[in-house]
Structures are given as C-alpha cells and as structure tokens.
Amino acid sequence: MRQMTDKKFFNIMLVCIIAVTLIFFCADNISRNGGFFGKKNQPVLTEELRELFSTRPAYGLGINKELKGEITVQIFFVDDDESNWDAESISLFMKPIKEGLRFIEKQADRYGVELEFEIQYHASTVSGEKDKLRYKGSVLDGSDGTHTHDMMEQLADNFGYYSTRQLYESYKYQSDGREVVFVAVVNKDGISTARQQQSADYGGDYVEHAIIFTNYIGRNLPLDKKSDRASTVAHEVMHLFGAPDLYIKRAVERYTSYKYPKDIMLGDTDDMRRLEVCEYTAYTVGWVDAPPELE
C-alpha cells in the first residue's frame, strides 16, 4: 500500500512538471511570436529602444559616406589556401552580386534617392591579375571567434600599393571621384561580414570593406543552386554605409520583427521580393533626414 502511494505521488509530480513546462513554453512563444488566434502582440517600446532608433552611429564615417549617386563597386574574387575561383564560378556568382545591388538601387528609388552602381571586378582568371588575388593563408569567417582583418592590406600590397588608403585613393581617382566600395568574395562556406567603421576613433586611414563567402557556413550549395547570396550581398553593402544589424539584441529583434519584418538588416532569404529597406534603415544610410515615428 505504501509503494502504491509513492508511485502515484511520483506520477502526479511528473504530470505537474510537464504541465508547468508547457505553460512556460507556450507563454514565451505567444509573447515572442504573436498573440492568440494569430494576432501579434506589440512588443513594449522602451525609452532605450526609442533612443536607439533615433540614432545612426555609423553614418558618414570612413570612406563610404553617401549611399546615393554613382558608386563604383570593386569586386575582388580572392583565392586562398582552401579555395579558388575559375571563370565559370565567377560568372555564376556575378548573378547574385548584380541582384543584390539592384535591390539596393530599387529600394533607394522608393525613397526618392538616385543611386546607380557600376561593377568592376578583379580575378586570377583575368590576364595580369593571377598572383594579385591570392590571400596568403586561409580567410577566416569568425565562426570560431577569429576574423580576417588584413584582407585589404594584402590586396593593396599585391596590387603594388603602399597602404590600403593609397589603394582607395587610386580607385577613387580612376572613378572620377565617385564613392568606391570594396568587396572581397571567397569561394567557400563561411559567415560573411562587413568591416565597417564604427566610430571616429578608427581614424582616417581605415578602409571599409566586405568579405562575402559563397555559402553560409555548413550549407555547401553549388553556385547554380538557389540561395540567399543576393540578400547577403545587399545586407553587407548596406552595412558599409552605416546600416546596423537589427537582430543582435533580443529586444531590438523583437521590436523590428514586429514593426519591420521584411527589413534587409533583420534577415536574409533566397527570395528578394520578400525584403525591403524599412524607414529606420533608410535613416541610418542617409536616405531620409529624420528617424521614423515609433509606436
């Protein structure tokens, strides 16, 4: 009789634990992803969020100041110790590059901003550039906490310049004074990143650039397969002109997921038609002069 009582008590406690766990899980899921019957709950708009969405801390810093007018995009198809490019791979990857840049042009037009990118590319398949696109070592993607910081330094040296700043000034002169964007593309899986100037403390010699991998780490998709590559290109180029990630802090992600679920700085997708540049991101890159009204 005593054993039966203990067993019943154990079963009751087990049921209670499971029930409480489910209640907490459901409550958190409802809070984060929407209310009952599919109606989303609006996240609390704190003073901290209001202050955050009224600033654009990286706008106008570094070499990439104005995301408007005519801009030259210098694409470097970089080989390293683990990967290389051939003519076919370059041709395939030029498609998402063009699509990503077209997306930004169309979004600028939505805000009444004239923007046109001109693409120039460099690759080991081009005559005279074979040894100039070799990165000494392996390009690191940050997945293990380490990043490649000397990409532009190596490229500047390979092309015969004394510094990254001299490289930049040369390409700016060749582009008749237009803005110049530097993008290095590596033919392997990895986490793409933008080496963006975050504050005036970096000094005037800092040359912003993006390092883009052909696939997000672990996907290993052939270049002719549909992927989120175009949105990655657009996302990283927007970074270079001051657009911040909208998914770093949970409170920011919750609010932007509710307010601006399609924003390019919140996520990526293989269907660019599902993305846009929201009012806040437009403000951070200078397309509008005032921050958005928040509710």
Predicted regions, residues:
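N-terminal Sec-pathway targeting helices
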Residues: 2-16
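Catalytic Zn2+-binding segment of zinc metalloproteases
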Residues: 237-252
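Propeptide-to-catalytic entry region of secreted or membrane-anchored zinc metalloproteases
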Residues: 34-177
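Auxiliary, metal-adjacent structural segments of Zn-dependent hydrolase domains
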Residues: 161-207
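Hydrophobic membrane-insertion alpha-helices, especially the h-region
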Residues: 13-25
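Short pre-active-site segment immediately N-terminal to the catalytic Zn-binding motif
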Residues: 211-233
